[in-house]
Design a protein with these regions (language model features):
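Active-site helical microenvironments for divalent-metal-assisted chemistry
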Residues: 2-189, 193-245, 250-304, 311-322
Length: 326
């Protein structure tokens, strides 16, 4: 990414050796880094980054990967720089990863930001997790064996794996919502991957027939996907020993999109294609419209940030129609 800035190699050299596509991507990412730090100029840099993203989605995927690398090596920088970069990452890059559905990058960025922005809280959460790590791991492994047997007995083929809540998500529950560590419902979880959408609902029936579901903890994102194309069934049940455990049920394709987001469209031999009707592309088109409507750079940044942070709400009308609320 830094080759044009840090070496004698030019864009013309890259174009000659690797073609127009690679040269365009390198140029797009390089331009995002070309302005010096400073409040107004930093706003302008962010504006250019967002517009470059809207025009070529691969630019922002490269940029997100670059920022993740920067965060992983942030310990070598001065404390004030660590805080500034972490705050920018939490404000801009992590929400972007979320909006594009790239969960793996979002989670790691948020956890790394928490380490530098809230070091005491981070260490407290880490100590709580470490204190019973083996006990929780053994519990989840035992529960997975139970689920595997249930699926086998009912003729459902599925892959079952454990999952644990990320540091930043725990931080928000504890410090922003005032919950105790042991009262967080989805601290432990299990993900069930099946072959078809129909089997997702069959699996849900099997789970609810053997374990008591927790009221108000069921969400069907298959019937009503999130705005970033995320699909899955979520339910929390009362497991063995009376412990709450969240279960996510989805197909392999849904799992790939949930983990990789929009990037999944270019992986695995491009089995699926991004279409212009895709919700993510609709959001990107909206960004270009915001640029035209904004009075100045700061107004544009404010509008886009609000749009990035927006959590779309879906409701059912009395007639059963799905409505999207801002």
């Amino acid at each position: 990414i830094d080759i044009v800035e840090d070496t004698l190699i030019t864009l013309a050299d890259i174009k000659y050796n690797f073609g127009d596509t690679v040269a365009t991507l390198v140029d797009g990412v390089t331009k995002l880094k070309s302005l010096p730090n400073g409040t107004k100029k930093q706003d302008e840099n962010i504006r250019k980054m967002i517009l470059a993203m809207a025009q070529n989605l691969r630019v922002i995927i490269i940029k997100l990967s670059d920022r993740l690398h920067n965060m992983r090596t942030l310990k070598y920088m001065k404390p004030e720089k660590q805080i500034a970069i972490s705050q920018e990452t939490l404000d801009i890059y992590a929400p972007l990863a979320h909006r594009l559905g790239i969960a793996k990058i979002k989670w790691e960025l948020e956890d790394l930001c928490l380490r530098y922005l809230k070091p005491e809280e981070y260490e407290h959460i880490k100590s709580l997790i470490d204190s019973k790590r083996n006990e929780r791991s053994e519990y989840v492994e035992s529960f997975i064996k139970t689920i595997v047997k249930l699926l086998h007995d009912t003729g459902i083929k599925g892959n079952v794996k454990g999952r644990f809540k990320h540091f930043y998500s725990i931080y928000k529950k504890m410090y922003e919502k005032g919950k105790e560590f042991d009262d967080i419902y989805d601290l432990m979880g299990v993900r069930i991957i099946v072959d078809t959408e129909g089997e997702c609902y069959n699996t849900l029936g099997v789970i609810h027939s053997h374990f008591k579901p927790v009221p108000g903890r069921f969400k069907d994102y298959i019937a009503v996907p999130k705005s970033n194309n995320y699909q899955s069934i979520h339910t929390t049940i009362v497991g063995p020993q009376g412990k709450f455990i969240e279960i996510q049920i989805r197909t392999e394709e849904m799992d790939r999109v949930a983990e990789e987001g929009i990037a999944a469209h270019w992986s695995y031999k491009e089995k699926t294609k991004v279409t212009k009707g895709d919700q993510v592309y609709g959001w990107l088109r909206n960004i270009l419209e915001l640029q035209n409507e904004a009075e100045d750079t700061q107004d544009f940044i404010k509008s886009v940030t609000e749009d990035i942070m927006n959590e779309t709400v879906f409701v059912f009308s009395p007639k059963g129609d799905i409505l999207e609320l801002p």
